[in-house]
Amino acid sequence: MRIDNTLSLPMPPDAAWALLLDIPYIAPCLPGTQLTATIDDRRYQGTVSLRLGPIALTFEGEAEITDIDEAARRVTVRAQGRENRGRGSAHADVSFQVCERDGGTEVAVSTDLTLAG
């Protein structure tokens, strides 16, 4: 499934770009996300809890920054995990694109999400 979102930030694009690359700083801004370990400067372990209708799921896994394009202000993250009750798995490729908009910043977020189990 593909999910596309945008968000507006009242700051210059360069400042937003710097924050976007600080995963421990921005992780608490992502609903249901909790970092549990930093493996290195591009890989992190954590949990993501979400609801799909009446179903509540918590996935434990790893996220890795797979590409950083400084010139385009685009970063790509690959995340994968297993549901903590062992019933399923999730895999997501997420790209964040930072652009200047109306004196502030717009961040376009594109997610390709696969759930199994």
Task: Label each residue range with its predicted role.
Residues 28-34, 60-64, 93:
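Short small/polar-residue motifs
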Residues 6-10, 49-51, 64, 97-99, ...:
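Generic structural detector for well-ordered beta-strands
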Residues 2-8, 43, 58-60, 74, ...:
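Intrinsic-disorder/low-complexity, polar/charged segments enriched in Ser/Thr/Lys/Arg/Asp/Glu/Gln
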Residues 29, 56-58, 87-88:
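Alpha-helix N-cap/helix-start motif
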Residues 1-43, 51-53:
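Hydrophobic ligand-binding cavity/cleft-lining segments
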Residues 38-81:
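Glycine-rich portal/gate segments that line the openings of hydrophobic small-molecule binding cavities
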Residues 67, 81-117:
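Beta-strand/loop substructures that line and gate deep hydrophobic ligand-binding cavities in soluble
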